Design a protein with these regions (language model features):
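A short, N-terminal "cap"/entry segment at the start of jelly-roll beta-barrel domains
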Residues: 1-46
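Short secondary-structure boundary/capping segments
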Residues: 24-26, 45-46, 53, 69-70, ...
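Short strand-coil-strand connectors
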Residues: 30, 64-68, 91
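A structure-centric signal for secondary-structure junctions around beta-strands
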Residues: 31, 50, 94-95
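Short, conserved beta-strand element in jelly-roll/cupin
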Residues: 48-63
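Short acidic-glycine-tyrosine-enriched beta hairpin
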Residues: 67-82
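Ligand-binding loop in jelly-roll beta-barrel domains
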Residues: 82-106
Length: 106
């Protein structure tokens, strides 16, 4: 990226084009990919090829990483290493997360 992208508000992110259950691209720069997911898939996700961070923007639910489950809500920061089984469960209608994939594919 040859410039700094403008700030993206939650309202703007909610308006990004996406398909149901999938995240929308916010921006990509080298080994960093920022996405936004409103109502992500409820249940297991396919393990990803890169480490990732989730930042809960709105709503509530449960976050499972392998066999550990945590209640999550706005402001929570969640980590998942590449190739690890994870997913969201029992998410509210307004649940949304910022998703940051970073580092090389593993």
């Amino acid at each position: 990226m040859d410039h700094t992208p403008p700030p993206t508000s939650l309202a703007a992110a909610l308006g990004l084009p996406r398909t149901l259950g999938r995240s929308a691209e916010v921006f990509v720069d080298g080994d960093l990919e920022v996405r936004f997911a409103a109502r992500p898939t409820n249940g297991p996700q396919v393990p990803h090829l890169r480490d990732e961070l989730y930042f809960v923007a709105a709503g509530s639910g449960r976050y499972r990483v392998e066999d550990k489950v945590s209640d999550v809500g706005p402001g929570d920061l969640l980590f998942c290493a590449a190739h690890v089984a994870h997913g969201f469960e029992d998410i509210s209608e307004d649940f949304s997360v910022w998703v940051l994939f970073y580092g090389p594919r593993k």
